[in-house]
């Protein structure tokens, strides 16, 4: 969350309204991440933590206690615990480590891949094949092994795709492991009055611990002594500003007070000593870890859809199988043969190639997205992003550039706009006036930040600087303007300095000047604007010092309010040339007694800073809105800043008003405004803390544009759950440890690749390698495209199922020789159809893909009624008729006219019948009949392949004409078309195929018998799409668009 920090420099009130710093105590005392109070009640808690309990935000009181009270509470002292007492507490509380979640054994993970979704259907098919083979083998040891081979192939398909999916999933690491990586290994502790270095896991409540710059905090500490100590809380709270730590109780909120240091955060500088008040799972990070491990693991939308599809296919297969089992029994077949028919029909309905197709398609899309800076960890998350209807986005680093930047300046009684673009090379304000030169000099000199060495060739805005975010922003601004800040500093040698502190709220330094004609020393100062103004009696206007009268104070206040209202951090700057007579170059300045003027200074101007929006974000937010996706900002930053950024990126659009805006416009109290009149809402974490679920649902439902500010990790999780209660598919972005529970709970968690913590990355399903919100929109489009393309692929695959099923039904009902064998069907499903099915992964989006509303859960299905009816009863029937025509043509040309085939099956299949007559009296031996049957298989197979060529082309689009889409733009689809013909020709004409796989060489004319039906399929589908486009919303559109 980068620069969402608060620093005391900016913690100043504007007419009673807190500016951009720490919020008002009364309003904000319960905000941020409240610490779980250690429960000392005697009642025993179950080991398994209740996630709802973890979401409760309770208070910690230890920061309010004196040292004596702490010693009494934890039975400790400034001499530390005794070793014996520490051992007792360690035995009672356990080690200072995070309890790992109960892991799933790898074998279980592997087996889940083997039996989930499509896999279960294929296993069922394989088992049924083996059962059928077993039954036939028991009757006749010389029976065909087709069913045996088919079962083996189905099992191999499941195992291979399962292994592929398992290794893909295995790349993601355990969330808790990344938390443990953040934990310090050693700690310096005082025990028995002596300092010891012990493993951090052996620390207990009451231990007295010392930390220094560079150390990680080994437990939650109540600081009792500190010297220049600053900590980095960014991994926990998202605040990147270094936070000072001291023994003072400064705030009701444990996160805001200075005398608490948190487990796993980093001590940046200085030293500190404190009592351990929480260890392991009781620490804040322990609670977050438990919260992250206790949520999530819901099925992805695509997993739900695949499960739904499996139910449909299984339902159709079993229903049709049972129906024809009954028909077979009624027609006099034995129960055993009827069971064989039942199994054959069920297996014929199983889309054997679809599991591999979906897995490969998702993988290909994941690779394509990686090239667009979206790294997908969970394959199914590819599609989930396309289903997203709400994006809960972090502010800093995602919507913004994650760097403080000078945005506005106020000098000479005018507000000037600075360039906040990535390179800041186009500042439009006038840089020649004397006032500007004076202001620029103060900004350059009154600054402790410095560039690291060895960056001469690095662009200014990308140079690494040592200093906090605000100081760095001022340094880079000065460097862009002046060209060489270090040169200015060397020409204006620093004589003495008072660093910023929270009491004074200003920074001061005294310098020699670079003017050889002027020997006076220059005092420069910056700090909280009204504190700086208090120290001034004059103001520089047009290069001249004028009295600071009420008129100028009003101008200052107006400018200050305007910049503060933009959510910007404002600093004031002033200077004073010290009289040479009183302060010669040899004067001994004393910063303790401050033996130099700190009043009657000359006010020069204001600078305001903000973490500016990324240039690509407004357009991305607009695209989301047109795609029906609501973008909600969820940030830990101040509401004013959050609202300003939300307006600048379009999350709150130009004409939208919040309740506060309406009250201000109508000049009425906020309470009198009807909240539903406000299109936008800015919800403070304090308000959210007191809301019921129904009130939160009301906000999510009735406000189109929402910003949540000052939120804690628990609240972010509650927001995600609130969105999911509305049946939204929720995407969440985050980068800190504090974001991991919400990332895990969301339908798709998106972590930042650059600024993100390991914990956030492991909790997420997707990682943005460039931390850019615009990449999410790219991902949404890819996700929608993959859903469309999987739907097209399923439609393509299902169509030929009818043509594969009908031969078995006619075989049973009409008693004709079998038109196509199971091995032949297998070569369609896992041979000619695989490459074309996968080629849909490369199909471009149709024009309306980002103008559609997000698909609705459980309504807009992957396989809906329209798709099933169109594939099975329309295109599927056409294919069947064409294939049967070719089969009967082959049989007729060889002597068996269609009417003579009806009822011939039993005689045809008798091995000892060597003189079966055809329509012309010719006699056929069993081996001759068998070769002719295989020729019928091949003709039927070739007909399906030819018709599938047309089916492949028409599936390129669902609404647009294929000519609008571009018939030959998808090179992989052309490869798919070619592969079908090549594989079919190879199987038909390769020597030894008749006896190995039951394919025979076909005469050339048989390849063209089904061609008119292929053309009919193409024309029929183009007419369907034309009517859909021409009559939107009509009966045709509703029933023919799948």
Swiss-Prot record:
It comes from Rhinella marina (Cane toad). GO terms for biological process: intracellular potassium ion homeostasis; intracellular sodium ion homeostasis; potassium ion import across plasma membrane; sodium ion export across plasma membrane. Its main location: membrane. Composed of two subunits: alpha (catalytic) and beta. The gene is ATP12A. The modification Phosphoserine is found at residue 961. Belongs to the cation transport ATPase (P-type) (TC 3.A.3) family. Type IIC subfamily. Residues 1-105, 171-306, 357-790, 842-861, 957-970, 1026-1042 are cytoplasmic. Catalyzes the hydrolysis of ATP coupled with the exchange of H(+) and K(+) ions across the plasma membrane. Responsible for potassium absorption in various tissues. Residues 1-51 are annotated as: Disordered. It is an enzyme of class 7 (translocase). InterPro entries: ATPase_P-typ_cation-transptr_C, ATPase_P-typ_cation-transptr_N, ATPase_P-typ_cyto_dom_N, ATPase_P-typ_P_site, ATPase_P-typ_TM_dom_sf, ATPase_P-typ_transduc_dom_A_sf, Cation_transp_ATPase_P-type, HAD-like_sf. This is Potassium-transporting ATPase alpha chain 2. PROSITE patterns: ATPASE_E1_E2. It is a multi-pass membrane protein. SMART domains: Cation_ATPase_N. The chain crosses the membrane at residues 106-126, 150-170, 307-326, 339-356, 791-810, 821-841, 862-884, 937-956, 971-989, 1005-1025. It catalyses: K(+)(out) + ATP + H2O + H(+)(in) = K(+)(in) + ADP + phosphate + 2 H(+)(out). Keywords: ATP-binding, Hydrogen ion transport, Ion transport, Magnesium, Membrane, Metal-binding, Nucleotide-binding, Phosphoprotein, Potassium, Potassium transport, Translocase, Transmembrane, Transmembrane helix, Transport. Residues 1-15 have a biased composition (Polar residues). Residues 127-149, 327-338, 811-820, 885-936, 990-1004 are lumenal. It is found in: Membrane. GO terms for cellular component: plasma membrane. Mg(2+) binds at residues 735, 739. The active site is at 394 (4-aspartylphosphate intermediate). The keyword ATP-binding applies. GO terms for molecular function: ATP binding; ATP hydrolysis activity; metal ion binding; P-type potassium:proton transporter activity; P-type sodium:potassium-exchanging transporter activity. Residues 38-48 have a biased composition (Basic residues).
């Amino acid at each position: 969350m980068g620069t969402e920090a608060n620093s005391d420099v900016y913690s100043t009130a504007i007419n009673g309204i807190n500016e951009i710093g720490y919020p008002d105590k009364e309003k904000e005392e319960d905000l941020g991440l409240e610490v779980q109070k250690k429960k000392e009640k005697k009642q025993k808690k179950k080991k398994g933590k209740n996630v709802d309990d973890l979401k409760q935000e309770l208070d910690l009181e230890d920061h309010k206690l004196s040292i004596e009270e702490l010693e009494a509470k934890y039975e400790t002292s400034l001499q530390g615990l005794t070793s014996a007492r520490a051992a007792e507490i360690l035995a009672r509380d356990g080690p200072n480590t995070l309890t790992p979640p109960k892991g799933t054994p790898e074998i279980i993970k592997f087996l889940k891949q083997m039996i989930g979704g499509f896999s279960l259907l294929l296993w069922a098919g394989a088992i049924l094949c083996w059962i059928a083979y077993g039954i036939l083998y028991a009757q006749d040891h010389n029976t065909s092994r087709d069913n045996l081979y088919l079962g083996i192939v189905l099992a191999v398909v499941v195992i291979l795709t399962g292994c592929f999916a398992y290794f893909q999933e295995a790349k993601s690491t355990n969330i808790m492991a990344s938390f443990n990586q953040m934990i310090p290994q050693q700690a310096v502790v005082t025990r028995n009055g002596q300092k010891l270095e012990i493993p951090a896991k052996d620390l207990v409540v009451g231990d007295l611990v010392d930390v220094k710059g560079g150390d990680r905090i080994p437990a939650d500490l109540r600081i009792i002594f500190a010297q220049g100590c600053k900590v980095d809380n960014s991994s926990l709270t998202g605040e990147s500003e270094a936070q000072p730590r001291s023994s003072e109780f400064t705030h009701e909120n444990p996160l805001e007070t200075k005398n608490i240091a948190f487990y796993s955060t980093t001590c940046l500088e200085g030293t500190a000593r404190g009592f351990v008040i929480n260890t392991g799972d009781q620490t804040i990070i322990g609670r977050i870890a438990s919260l992250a491990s206790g949520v999530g693991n819901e099925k992805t939308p695509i997993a739900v859809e695949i499960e739904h599809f499996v139910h449909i296919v299984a339902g159709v297969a079993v229903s049709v199988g049972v129906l024809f089992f009954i028909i077979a029994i009624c027609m006099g077949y034995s129960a055993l043969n009827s069971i064989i028919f039942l199994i054959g029909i069920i297996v014929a309905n199983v889309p054997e190639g679809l599991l591999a197709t979906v897995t490969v398609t998702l993988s290909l899309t994941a690779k394509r997205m990686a090239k667009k800076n979206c790294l997908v960890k969970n394959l199914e998350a590819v599609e989930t992003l396309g289903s997203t209807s709400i994006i809960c986005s972090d502010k800093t680093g995602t919507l913004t550039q994650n760097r403080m930047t000078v945005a506005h300046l106020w000098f000479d009684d005018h507000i000037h706009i600075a360039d906040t673009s990535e390179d800041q090379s186009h500042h439009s304000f006038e840089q020649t006036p004397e006032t500007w030169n004076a202001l620029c000099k103060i900004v350059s000199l009154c600054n402790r930040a410095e560039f690291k060495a060895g960056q001469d060739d690095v662009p200014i805005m990308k140079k690494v600087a040592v200093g906090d975010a605000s100081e760095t922003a001022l340094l880079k601004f000065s460097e862009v303007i002046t060209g060489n800040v270090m040169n200015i500093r060397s020409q204006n040698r620093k004589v003495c300095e008072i660093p910023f502190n929270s009491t004074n709220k200003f920074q001061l330094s005294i310098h020699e000047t670079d003017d050889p004609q002027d020997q006076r020393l220059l005092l420069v100062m910056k700090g909280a604007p009204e504190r700086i103004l208090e120290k001034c009696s004059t103001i520089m206007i047009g290069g001249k010092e004028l009295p600071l009268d009420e008129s100028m104070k009003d101008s200052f206040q107006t400018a200050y309010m305007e910049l503060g209202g933009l959510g910007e951090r404002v600093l004031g700057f002033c200077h004073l040339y010290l009289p040479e007579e009183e302060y010669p170059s040899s004067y001994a300045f004393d910063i303790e007694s401050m033996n130099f003027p700190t009043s009657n200074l000359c006010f020069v101007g204001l600078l305001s800073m903000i973490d500016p929006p990324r240039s690509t974000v407004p357009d991305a937010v607009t695209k989301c809105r047109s795609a029906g996706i609501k973008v909600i900002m969820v940030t830990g930053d101040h509401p004013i800043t959050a609202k300003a950024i939300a307006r600048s990126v379009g999350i709150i659009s130009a004409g939208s008003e919040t309740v506060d805006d309406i009250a201000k416009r109508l000049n009425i109290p906020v309470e009198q405004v009807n909240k539903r009149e406000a299109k936008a809402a800015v919800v403070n974490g304090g308000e959210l803390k007191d809301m019921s679920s129904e009130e939160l649902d009301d906000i999510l439902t009735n406000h189109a544009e929402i910003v949540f500010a000052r939120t804690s990790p628990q609240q972010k999780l509650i927001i995600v759950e609130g969105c999911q209660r509305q049946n939204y598919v929720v995407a969440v972005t985050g980068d800190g440890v504090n974001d991991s529970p919400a990332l895990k709970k969301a339908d798709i968690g998106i972590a930042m690749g650059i600024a993100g913590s390991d914990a956030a990355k492991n909790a997420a399903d997707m990682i943005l390698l460039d931390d850019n919100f615009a990449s999410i929109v790219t991902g949404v489009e890819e996700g929608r495209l993959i859903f469309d393309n999987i739907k097209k692929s399923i439609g393509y695959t299902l169509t030929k199922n009818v043509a594969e099923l009908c031969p078995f039904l006619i075989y049973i009902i009409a008693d004709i020789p079998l038109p196509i064998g199971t091995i032949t069907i297998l070569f369609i499903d896992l041979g000619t159809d695989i490459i074309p099915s996968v080629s849909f992964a490369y199909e471009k989006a149709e024009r309306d893909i980002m103008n559609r509303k997000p698909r609705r859960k459980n309504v807009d299905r992957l396989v809906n009624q329209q798709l099933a009816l169109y594939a099975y009863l329309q295109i599927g029937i056409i294919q069947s008729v064409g294939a049967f025509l070719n089969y009967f043509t082959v049989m007729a040309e060889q002597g068996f006219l269609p009417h003579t085939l009806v009822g011939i099956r039993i005689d045809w299949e008798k091995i000892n019948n060597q003189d079966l007559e055809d329509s012309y009296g010719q006699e056929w031996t069993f081996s001759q009949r068998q070769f002719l049957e295989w020729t019928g298989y091949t003709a039927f197979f070739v007909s399906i392949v030819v018709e599938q060529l047309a089916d492949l082309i028409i599936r390129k689009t669902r609404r647009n004409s294929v000519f609008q889409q571009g018939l030959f733009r998808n090179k992989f689809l052309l490869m798919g078309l070619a592969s079908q013909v090549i594989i079919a020709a190879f199987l038909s004409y390769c020597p030894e195929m008749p006896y190995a796989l039951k394919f025979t060489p076909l005469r050339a004319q048989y390849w063209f018998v089904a061609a008119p039906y292929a053309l009919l399929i193409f024309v029929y589908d183009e007419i369907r799409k034309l009517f859909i486009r021409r009559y939107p919303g009509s009966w045709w559109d509703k029933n023919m668009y799948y």
